Amino acid sequence: MSRYRGPRLRITRRLGDLPGLTRKAAKRSHPPGQHGQARRKRSEYAIRLEEKQKLRFNYGISERQLVRYVKKARAQEGSTGTNLLKLLENRLDNVCFRLGFGPTIPGSRQLVNHGHVTVNGRITDIASYQCKAGDVIAIRDNKASKQLAQANLEFPGLANVPPHLELDKTKLSAKISAKTDREWVAIEINELLVVEYYSRKV
């Protein structure tokens, strides 16, 4: 399953607020479609599927990518669900979004893909790059790159920058001072349900 490129509000009407996907709010609270307003009791599978879809659409990744992250999270020590969220939060496109360099995760991915972002002084155009403590994320030192980031910083997608990201707005750079804290994950998600969804699939 490839990355979703369709109407974003249609997704948020079905799954709820996804700050990484869009900053627009859905006007109608019921799901899209002819029978969107009908209330049906959902199965446990449907609930797990919905949590999985929240994660996939918020971070803008394909099903195949998410499966890889689940496998990697499972191989690490500690809670698989927490490990999964940390892996997604540490993606370079998400870090740029959390810093305010991009309006959404797709917008931040474009910044990265177009070579506007550096990691430890080197241009890094891989959105899935795993940032780690000690890395310095910065906007490339040219006029076009700086203008893009400065415009986005005036109206950031999220109000608060996580404390482990030490942002210097004047230099358009940030140092990752510590590991990602589960408490600062922006999306409302039950990661345990996501792990349960993949328990028999991966």
Swiss-Prot record:
GO terms for cellular component: small ribosomal subunit. Residues 1-13 have a biased composition (Basic residues). PROSITE patterns: RIBOSOMAL_S4 (PS00632), S4 (PS50889). It comes from the Bacteria. One of its GO terms (molecular function) is rRNA binding. Residues 1-43 are annotated as: Disordered. One of the primary rRNA binding proteins, it binds directly to 16S rRNA where it nucleates assembly of the body of the 30S subunit. Part of the 30S ribosomal subunit. Contacts protein S5. The interaction surface between S4 and S5 is involved in control of translational fidelity. NCBIfam families: PRK05327.1, rpsD_bact. This is Small ribosomal subunit protein uS4.
